[in-house]
Amino acid sequence: MAFNMDPKKCPMPTQDPNVRNKNFKEVALGYTAEMAVNEAKRCIGCKNKPCQSGCPVGIDIPEFIAHVAEGDFEAAYQVINRSSSLPAVCGRVCPQESQCEGKCTRGIKNEPVAIGRLERFVADWHRENVHTAPIVPEWNGHKVAIIGAGPAGLTAAGDLAKLGYKVTVYEALHVAGGVLMYGIPEFRLPKAIVQQEIDGLKKMGVDFECNMVIGKVLTIDELMGEYGYEAVFVGSGAGLPRFMNIPGESLKGVYSANEFLTRSNLMKAYLPTSKTPIRTGKKVAVVGGGNVAMDAARSALRLGAESVYIVYRRGMAELPARKEEVEHAEEEGIIFKTLCNPVAIHPDEDGFVHSMTCIEMELGEPDASGRRRPIEKPGSEFELEVDTVIMSLGTSPNPLIRSTTPGLETNKHGCIVTEGDEGKTSRAGVYAGGDAVTGAATVIKAMGAGKAAAKAMDEYIRNK
């Protein structure tokens, strides 16, 4: 096979920015088969597989890419499926540039192989062309419970189902999917794709119980007692938003990004007939610089805002969001106001947001995170005229589970404490992973945690 020594990735086709910023259709259109084969031929098949070491779920990346280069897309899918339960999701939202692609040998002198785009292509090809029913293993006589139907919980459920366990997933919301459904907008991750992944788990025998708030409707003790589950995995995520505690944060028109995106993505609160309407406004400020901030800003634009600002206390180089998401936001007309920070939000005569006072910042010495610490510039305050403010400052786990589970150790941030990488908690038979343990992190890291915990749960039950 002839290698493709093009120094750059095959570009991803996308919707025109001036069209897509008015609709919720997926921005990235995906590779054609010809594009995928050509891009796969850029892989030089390193024997030591550095890219695989950057994948939290350990996909054999050179092997699946070699199959793509040969045009055997189903074989490529089977390689991915050995390690990942959600390839169509990961191919779209994982930060490959800091994981698998960040370790790619081609990336030392040129652009790395577009591993994420190839994973997405393979998953989409399989979904559109292969319609065989999954193999359902024989029941091994044991049953387990999963709390939370997000990426960690879905991964743990899938891996345990493959081992023959009777798996029940308890989800607090009315639909399964967790952050994949409520947090990531349609234009970045179509909900039909997430639903198809969930349907695949159902075909394997996984049961889903929605509208079940564990810690309120049922407790972990009840699940392991009268319900008879031999082990429980807690993958309940981190849905409790953080705020700045500045004057005016309780005004009408101030939202957490979590609330704004949940109501937009799941509850269609932007419709005039909604019982829980969301006020988008014409001039929107999103405070924060991560992927969630980009999602909120780009959603607000699509919901009719005329001007949308990203207000971030560090510079463009320090933005934690994926480079691709920042580029897409800029292309769509999002205005970046960096090196500034809100200090107060002001109301109009009816109690709605009217403006926001910000102060200019400069970067000092690195802080504990390794990034340069933002410092206020005295006397540099200025007014930003806005009518909606969305706070995207991170999230922490909901305290409900820890407050109703005696003996479950948590840290000062409310995250569940686990032992090593297995997800073992201070309670026998209780495992945890994903954002409930780490705080807000990436989809693929949550999946890696779910995968490791599933293996540990299997060993625990077999050795009882």
Question: Where would I find each of the regions flagged by the language model?
Answer:
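Feature captures the FAD/FMN-dependent oxidoreductase FAD-binding
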Residues: 75, 138, 143-147, 195-246, ...
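A conserved FAD-binding loop/helix module that cradles the flavin
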Residues: 436-462
